[in-house]
Amino acid sequence: MKITEQRQGAVIVLKPDGALVDQDCALFRGRMVEAMGASLGRFVIDLSAVPFVDSRGLETLVELTEELGKSGQALRLCAANKTIREVLELTELTSLFEHFEDANTAVRSFL
């Protein structure tokens, strides 16, 4: 999995490219932890290049969101495809994640 990082003001946008599945979760988590150490605690995960997320991927997103929330930081999701949005609904996780149509809208939500 390739993960690109872009800073937009005080917000870090991470864009994974590929499915967020078990074998890539450690890489994704490591990249997030690295970014957490060098940020103001505002993150957007751009899911536009993620075709699907398995249970381990969901677990990783939940854990990161909860960790960030405990320290007053925040994570937003954007550009999830229909399949990912349906998985979030079926697992009743839509209330945990703020989701936006695109990265710019998600970044502006922090203002």
Kindly label every feature range from the protein language model.
Residues 1-15:
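Short beta-strand/loop segment at the start of cytosolic alpha/beta domains
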Residues 1-4, 32-33, 107:
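Short low-complexity stretches enriched in small and charged residues
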Residues 4-6, 78, 100:
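General small-molecule cofactor/ligand-binding pocket signal
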Residues 16-18, 102:
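Active-site donor-binding loop signature of nucleotide-sugar glycosyltransferases
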Residues 98-111:
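A charged, well-structured terminal subsegment
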